[in-house]
């Protein structure tokens, strides 16, 4: 494992920034990656194609769910095992993660291609959107194995402490995507199919980059299949610990599909407006998530090493960081909402609606970090069941019923307001969990 001092003895704030900054850059790159498709498709001036990108969006959540379930679970276990001095277990985790990611990617790819028509109908396509959504999905499905591999391998590389190398892979993948997006979409006139092709190509390059690092420079990490055969039953532990991340991503996709099904009843412009508002605020939630996920190895290592004092300080500093960041970026997004929405939508009616909906989404920015942090803490200490329940709250148990209730009460505005109510409710419960752990760590530290 690289940089052991970073995990064990370094300044807490220095350790946080050393792990969080590369993770943030990776997430920003992913956001840029995600926004590039909608931005260049938006340049076509076709609201139906913009809406098609939004309708297929939940498929990205399905792929991300598989990747994060494997990658986050493996990352937490690898860091915790290293803290306890169990290096060989890390190799087993790495091997299991890589090969399971590959085979699941192939299965998901086949499933998406075979079931694309009923899937798109379920996701909320109407007659105007469907032809574009089908083209986008077909190309995306072919690249599913590379999407899953690139995302899970990025987490493995960070778990070894090589956050910079993980960042480089994401940068290269996004650079490829941003170069080929305008070429495929605008120059060659492939439209949404070109956006999907550029995304697949970018993920392929990122996968190759991570594979090269692991093969040539990995210490705990390996892609050799033999370690996986030594203890295949360990896959259950990895999946259990990574399940909260997977559930969160999957539920985000389900919530998005339910939202689109409700929005499409208000017209294609409503789907496009909510998609633009979501892209505008996605940067905030993704960066906060990156801070928490990037620092998860620090939490897991401190817990595995029995260092209660350091774990307590990590939690306090991360709470402060995520709340302050949420306040500042939420205010900035509110102030610049017209320019941000205008990046994705040119049609006047959809633009005006998008600027209204984004207000609801930014109001929850100060507290969303509490939910991410509490989930990552529970994963780091091996409390998988608690993390699963917490993941179910924000995107599932709270948001999905609220979408239908608020749509019935307030229409399109209510759909956006449902996200705010769910964010605040989940954050309140998460705050209670974090306070419980802080008190327990204070008592444990006092006993030492």
Tell me what each language-model feature is:
Residues 18-37, 139, 150, 173, ...:
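Transmembrane helical elements of multi-pass membrane transporters/channels
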Residues 50-110, 147-166, 260, 273-331, ...:
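Small-residue-rich hydrophobic transmembrane alpha-helices
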Residues 71, 140-158, 166-174, 195-208, ...:
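Short runs within selected transmembrane alpha-helices of multi-pass transporters and secretion channels
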Residues 62-65, 177-182, 207-211, 283-286, ...:
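Hydrophobic transmembrane alpha-helices of multi-pass small-molecule transporters
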Residues 28, 32-50, 120-127, 183-190, ...:
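Helix-terminus/linker motif at the lipid-water interface of multi-pass membrane proteins
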Residues 8-39, 43-44, 58-73, 77, ...:
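N-terminal transmembrane alpha-helices
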Residues 1-20, 78-145, 187-243, 299-364, ...:
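Short alpha-helical transmembrane segments in multi-pass integral membrane proteins
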Residues 41-61, 127-132, 192-193, 234-241, ...:
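Interfacial/gating helices of multi-pass transporter permease domains
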């Amino acid at each position: 494992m690289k940089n052991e001092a970073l995990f064990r003895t370094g300044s807490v704030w220095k350790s946080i920034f050393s792990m969080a900054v590369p993770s943030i850059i990776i997430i920003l790159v992913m956001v840029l990656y995600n926004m590039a498709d909608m931005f260049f498709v938006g340049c076509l001036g076709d609201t139906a194609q913009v809406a098609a990108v939004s309708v297929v969006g939940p498929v990205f959540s399905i792929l991300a769910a598989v990747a994060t379930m494997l990658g986050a679970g493996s990352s937490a276990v690898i860091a915790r095992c290293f803290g306890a001095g169990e290096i060989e277990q890390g190799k087993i985790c790495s091997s299991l993660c890589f090969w399971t990611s590959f085979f699941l990617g192939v299965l998901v790819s086949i499933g998406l291609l075979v079931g694309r028509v009923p899937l798109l109908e379920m996701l909320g396509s109407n007659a105007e959107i469907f032809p574009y959504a089908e083209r986008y999905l077909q190309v995306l499905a072919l690249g599913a194995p590379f999407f899953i591999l690139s995302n899970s391998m990025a987490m493995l590389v960070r778990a070894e402490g090589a956050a910079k190398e993980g960042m480089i892979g994401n940068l290269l993948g996004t650079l490829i995507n941003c170069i080929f997006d305008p070429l495929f979409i605008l120059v060659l006139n492939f439209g949404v199919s070109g956006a999907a092709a550029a995304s697949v190509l970018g993920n392929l390059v990122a996968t190759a980059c991570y594979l090269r690092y692991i093969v040539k420079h990995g210490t705990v990490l390996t892609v050799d299949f033999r370690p996986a055969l030594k203890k295949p039953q360990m896959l259950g532990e990895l999946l259990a610990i990574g399940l909260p991340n997977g559930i969160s991503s999957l539920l985000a996709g389900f919530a998005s599909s339910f939202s689109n099904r409700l929005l499409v009843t208000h017209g294609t412009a409503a789907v496009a407006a909510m998609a633009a508002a979501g892209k505008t605020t996605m940067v905030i939630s993704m960066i906060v998530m990156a801070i928490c996920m990037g620092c998860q190895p620090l939490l897991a290592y401190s817990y595995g090493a029995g260092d209660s004092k350091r774990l307590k300080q990590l939690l306090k500093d991360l709470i402060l960081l995520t709340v302050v960041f949420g306040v500042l970026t939420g205010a900035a997004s509110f102030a610049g909402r017209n320019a941000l929405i205008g990046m994705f939508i040119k049609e006047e009616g959809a633009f005006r609606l998008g600027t209204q909906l984004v207000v609801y989404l930014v109001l929850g920015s100060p507290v969303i970090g509490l939910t991410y942090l509490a989930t990552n803490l529970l994963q780091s200490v091996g409390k998988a069941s608690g993390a699963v329940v917490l993941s179910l709250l924000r995107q599932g148990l709270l948001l999905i019923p609220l979408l239908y209730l608020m749509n019935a009460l307030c229409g399109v505005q209510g759909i956006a307001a449902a996200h705010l109510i769910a964010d605040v409710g989940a954050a309140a419960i998460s705050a209670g969990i974090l306070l419980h752990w802080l008190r327990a760590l204070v008592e444990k530290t006092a006993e030492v």
